[in-house]
Design a protein with these regions (language model features):
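Glycine-rich phosphate/pyrophosphate-binding beta-alpha loops
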Residues: 1-5
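Histidine/acidic residue-rich metal-binding segments in metalloenzymes
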Residues: 6-127
Length: 127
């Protein structure tokens, strides 16, 4: 989850953290992005000379968030813990949350105002 070489948590860390949250009665929070895939795409873009802000959305196609959201939700479901997903920005992630909630799973999603008001064109703006 999240950012490779920074704050990425592997699945074993997620499992241990979710278990600890369950023991404490806390709700785990996840920023759902497949960090390995983002890192791979970033390297490919850099090799192509795409190094400006426009590379940001190109390195994060919607599947990157959808897959990670699905994985986090399934881990939480298996362990019986609620889950709070932050910065939800794709239909794929929303679909995963909606599906889980439809089954009665305590999964919540948060969106940033910018995700509701802006699109990827802001990364191509010369200003």
């Amino acid at each position: 989850m999240a950012y490779k070489n920074a704050i990425m948590a592997a699945d074993d860390t997620l499992v241990a953290s979710f278990e600890r949250c369950l023991e404490l009665g806390a709700v785990p929070t996840v920023h759902a992005e497949n960090g390995e895939l983002v890192y791979h795409l970033q390297r490919k873009l850099m090799a192509q000379g795409i190094t400006g802000p426009e590379a940001h959305p190109l390195s994060r196609p919607s599947q990157v968030e959808g897959e990670a959201a699905s994985r986090a939700i399934r881990i939480a479901e298996t362990l019986g813990t609620p889950l709070y997903l932050v910065h939800v920005s794709t239909k794929e992630a929303l679909d995963e949350i909606t599906y889980a909630r439809g089954k009665g799973q305590p999964v919540y999603g948060e969106v940033l105002a910018g995700h509701l008001l802006l699109d990827d064109s802001v990364y191509r703006d010369p200003d």
